[in-house]
């Protein structure tokens, strides 16, 4: 707790420090939303001029600014003026503004509902995607994250805009060696080599084939919901050759006996029981020599602050970051066993290879 006290020297106790932190988070969100940071000149701007430029009432702006100056988020070059310290100038950048707004709205709105959520659902992590802190915080306690986004287009737009800037994106290639897949292409030309399950608009399957061009794109299948598949760009090259199938991973796997079933950044979004449903659907479609490749962030047994926070972030949506033990549990419940884990050298990304257990 010493860090919260050092952040706010006036804090008499850690509780005071946490309170000041809550105030700061909220005031910064208001400044971001109303472009207050953008209107502050490099050499400082008077409160009166800033109120005129932004349309905020002078009294309100002064009260909010007083706290940010006291907490060193803003500077005060002279009485009645405020300026931006170098570290705060990031809030003039679109990337930082989008990210901060998203994590504040999506995380804080859900986190404040944790006590009520746990009281309603028991002291356990989310068991169903349609019973999540996010849904409760948004006013739809029986809807999943994606259901809520469909009903709240403004939230969906903010979410999509943040995802589009690629914050913390996972590497696709350079982790797992797909060359063995290419070696199989000549043994059975009719066999599907890779099925990209829940593959969105094909970024992953395209990158995999680009990395290992001896894998015929025509022997690969891109699967996602029909409304996603119809928006896959029509372009010359790899994606034009890949087979496209509209389906849900919660339904029976339509492509049987593929050499590889590849699923990236999917299980992260779902609670255990729904992950088991997804994996069982794949298991039922496997041939005896099929392999399942799961590309996800792998949680270490003793995660850092950032990784533990990311896991709790996912909990808001009924998702979950998993460690090796947790993936082993999913495998055993779904008819698979882990055969290898390939880890990225510069991140926590990994490709977990599983084999179907012969029954």
From Swiss-Prot:
Q: Which domain of life is it from?
A: Eukaryota
What pathway is this protein said to act in by its record? Mycotoxin biosynthesis
Name one molecular function that GO assigns to this entry: O-methyltransferase activity
> Which residues hold S-adenosyl-L-methionine?
198-199, 224, 248-249, 264-265
Ordered alphabetically, the record's keywords are: Methyltransferase, S-adenosyl-L-methionine, Transferase
- Name the enzyme group at the top EC level: transferase
One annotated GO biological process: secondary metabolite biosynthetic process
Summarize the record's disruption phenotype note. Answer: Results in the loss of production of equisetin and fusarisetin A.
Query: What Enzyme Commission number(s) appear in the record?
Result: 2.1.1.-
PANTHER family named among the record's database cross-references: O-METHYLTRANSFERASE (AFU_ORTHOLOGUE AFUA_2G17820)-RELATED (PTHR43712:SF11), PUTATIVE (AFU_ORTHOLOGUE AFUA_4G14580)-RELATED (PTHR43712)
Member of which family? Belongs to the class I-like SAM-binding methyltransferase superfamily. Cation-independent O-methyltransferase family.
Q: What's this protein's function?
A: Methyltransferase; part of the gene cluster that mediates the biosynthesis of HIV-1 integrase inhibitor equisetin and of fusarisetin A, both trans-fused decalin-containing tetramic acids showing also antimicrobial activity. The PKS module of fsa1 together with the enoylreductase fsa3 catalyze the formation of the polyketide unit which is then conjugated to L-serine by the condensation domain of the fsa1 NRPS module. Activity of the Dieckmann cyclase domain (RED) results in release of the Dieckmann product intermediate.
Quote the protein name from its UniProt record.
Methyltransferase fsa4
Q: Which organism is it from?
A: Fusarium sp. (strain FN080326)
